[in-house]
Amino acid sequence: MSRFFVSGYNSESSSEEEDLLSSEEELLTSSGEENEDSDFFNDDDESSSDEEDGRPSGPAYFLKKSFLKGAGGDSDSDSDDEGRKVVKSAKEKLLDDMKASIEVINVNKRTNNWIVVLSEFEKLGKLINRANQQNFGTPKFYVKLLASLDDSITETVNNEKDDKTMKADEARAFNTLRQRVKKQIKEFQVYFDLYKDVPENFDQEDESLDSFAKNQETREETRTLSPIFHNLKLINESRGKKNIDKSEQVTTLEGLISDEASDFELISLYQSLLSVRFDASSNQSFMAIQDWRSNKRDLNNLLDILVKSKVYQLSEEGQTTDDIDIEPTANEDGVKVIYGSVTSLIDRLDDEFTKSLQNTDPHSMEYVERLKDETEIYNLIVRGQAYIESIVADKQQSNQLARVVLRRLEHIYYKPNQLIKANEEEAWKNIKPSTQTPSEVIESLTQFLQSNKVFAKQALLYSIYYYAVNGDYNKAKELFLSAHFNLSDSALQVSYNRALVQLGLSAFRSGAIEESHKILNEMVNSQRSKELLGQGFNSKFPNQATVVEKQRLLPFHQHINLELLECVYMTCSLLIEIPALASNKDPKRRNASLKSFKSKLEFHDRQYFTGPPESIKDHIVHASIALQKGDWSKAYNLLSSIKIWHLFPDHDNLLAMMKNQLQIEGLRTYIFTYKAVYSKLSISKLSSIFGLLQENVSEVLTQMIEKLDINGEVSGDYIVFTTDSQRSKLQELAIVMNDKIQLLTEKNEKTSSNGYAKKNQSQTQPQAQSKEVEENKFRYANVNTNTDEF
């Protein structure tokens, strides 16, 4: 029968049972009480003897003996109280373990036992992680320990400099501990600095850092904030969080801007407003045009406030305050320097403008309309430069000033002088009148950046590009040769290639044909010209381009026309190769580029039907054929009909230069062709044929004689050719024909003798040599004749 129905159970024992069960949920019994619970598992004899001793039965049987009425005496209850332990929560136990580890650390660090200290510090770190996982937080005494360890480590390092007594294993443990303590200090840097400043705030060691921070915030919130700074604080705290409506924040900040706000409030508002707008477009290809123009307007308003204010300055060297509504301390001049960067805001605005151009169709009217905003951004850059110059003490060492100067240079270096002059007049009309010429502007900006190690080479490349674009080839060449760009960083590759190509184009415009050909040779023959000039990708999948490759791309209006580049290169090849072909020089000594041009001519000659020239290449090939015949006038007409020359700003002068070069090279080609036919030629006749002055003809002929291109002398109005040891073209063809006839005759003899060569009579031998002939016949029969020419 169940014990519930055993006699001895009554209502009084039931009520006592409920009270005792509730008390058991609140108290944890000692080990002695657990021994008493084990009486239940005794055998039957002991249970029967317990019943005789008056022990309870029924439901009361399962209750603790010490809680029942009449069970035991005062001595029993006293013994139970003595055996009962103090109960601690999980948090208290964890704190005790931490304090025990800290005590071990403090003891062993005094004896420089760093192995034990490291072991206990790692153990303490695990306990800290457990505390954070259970939402107990990091106690304040952990920060005190970090400060104490930092001091001990510093002292030990100083002692070790004098006498190195630390063992190898101790040194390894010490260095490991040093790095981990440094890492932990960095993680709790705010509290660490606060402890160093006000140690009294950490007297309550068991308090967690989270609750301590909340208490600090509660004390700070007792100070009332103005509506502007209250909203600013809310917006700043929400930055970086998900699901935040940026447009709503922009609307809120725009509504806070009013004439009643102080200068400090307006400066803070504009900084936050500009940053929020930039953040809103961070996940887009480029910033919306309306938002970009709003940021440009607000940045101009911010500069207006900064220029007018004599109390506040915005600089990267400014002071940061703990609260956004607290103004920085004034300096000796009474000026409060606020932490911020006008240069960074201008850089970001300019980058968004560039990305907008890169993501717009360059052949559409949208691109042209967007490009009109470049004047506005340039005016803003000039304003920013003027403001930074007014607040910076050491201009040469200011990085923010160097950055904005480089930005200004990037917007004008590729333009002709007329556009630069217009931009400068528009930018300075509201600041102060400027009397500098475009070349003086470029030179002053470049000279300023030469003191900056980061931007010096970049500025010099921009300067070279500018001089090359505006026709000052000698100046650009001098700068390029003196710069030693071969020691520069690879980040300058695009700028270097652009400057080099523009230098080659400038050499062509100035009449330095051979130099232009050498400069442009490698770039034109490269398969990666677009990529090397920052004008596109050569891969089949542009979407796979990296971020760095996309950043190197330039807007379309800064591109160098690759068709113009190829046209200039082929024209240079024409002017160099046609006289070289007529001179009958050793073809092995010719450059590979000239051979490729000759192959184009040979390919054209093999065509059965050739129509009128259509492409740029066709015009140049037809002009080459005309020049070979000495018809320089036809060659000039073909070249001048190419419309791409109009891309040069001074195309009239360019065509005049090309005409003169064609006349000179036509004269040289004529001399090379007919020097073996004529014994002398009239200089006046040559002058009339090629449209040159007699003085110029005499000068060209004299140069050819000095370079040993021809043998002769200029005598009065004639050039007299002497006997030329060099074979003529007809003689060379006759010699080649004779060699081939001999080869054909020998081959026919071998064929008629069934593969045997014709034997001389002196070689007739008896039958003993027949075996040797038999062995050698395959050598004659297998002659390779694939290379024979007929």
Curated annotation (Swiss-Prot):
Q: What is its main location?
A: cytoplasm
Q: Where found?
A: Cytoplasm
Answer yes or no on keyword Cytoplasm.
yes
The Polar residues compositionally biased stretches are 751-770
Q: Single Gene Ontology BP term?
A: formation of cytoplasmic translation initiation complex
Is Protein biosynthesis found in the keyword set? yes
GO CC, one annotated term = eukaryotic 48S preinitiation complex
**Region (Disordered), start-end ranges:** 1-62, 748-790
Acidic residues: compositionally biased ranges: 14-53
One term of GO molecular function: RNA binding
Query: Which InterPro entries does the record cross-reference, listed alphabetically?
Result: EIF3C (IPR027516), EIF3C_N_dom (IPR008905), PCI_dom (IPR000717)
Give residue ranges for domain PCI. Answer: 556-728
Q: What keyword terms does UniProt attach to this protein?
A: Cytoplasm, Initiation factor, Protein biosynthesis
Outline the subunit composition.
Component of the eukaryotic translation initiation factor 3 (eIF-3) complex.
Q: What does this protein do?
A: Component of the eukaryotic translation initiation factor 3 (eIF-3) complex, which is involved in protein synthesis of a specialized repertoire of mRNAs and, together with other initiation factors, stimulates binding of mRNA and methionyl-tRNAi to the 40S ribosome. The eIF-3 complex specifically targets and initiates translation of a subset of mRNAs involved in cell proliferation.
Which family is it part of?
Belongs to the eIF-3 subunit C family.
According to UniProt, the name of this protein is: Eukaryotic translation initiation factor 3 subunit C
What organism, scientifically named, is this protein from?
Answer: Lodderomyces elongisporus (strain ATCC 11503 / CBS 2605 / JCM 1781 / NBRC 1676 / NRRL YB-4239)
